[in-house]
């Protein structure tokens, strides 16, 4: 019998300021991977995390 996937889902968080900001410390876009419980959090995740390219804490939004 096949097992179900479960409620935990691996997602990718991407910096929102890296995409629009041209004056950055280094080129590139900051990405983090994490898990979320799709039963508790149905909408897209937004977390404030440190971005090494912007060199500050910025909002990271879920992309996958």
Swiss-Prot record:
GO biological process entries: translation
Protein name: Large ribosomal subunit protein bL33c
Gene coding for it: rpl33
GO molecular function: structural constituent of ribosome
Principal cellular location given in the protein's record: plastid
Cellular localisation: Plastid, Organellar chromatophore
Similarity-based family: Belongs to the bacterial ribosomal protein bL33 family.
Alphabetically ordered keywords of this record: Organellar chromatophore, Plastid, Ribonucleoprotein, Ribosomal protein
One Gene Ontology cellular component annotation held by this UniProt entry: organellar chromatophore
């Amino acid at each position: 019998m096949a097992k179900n996937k479960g409620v935990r889902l691996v997602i990718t968080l991407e910096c929102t300021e890296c995409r629009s900001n041209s004056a950055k410390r280094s080129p590139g876009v900051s990405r983090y991977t994490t898990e979320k419980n799709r039963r508790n959090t149905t909408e897209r995740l937004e977390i404030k995390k440190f971005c090494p390219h912007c060199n500050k804490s910025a909002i990271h939004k879920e992309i996958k």
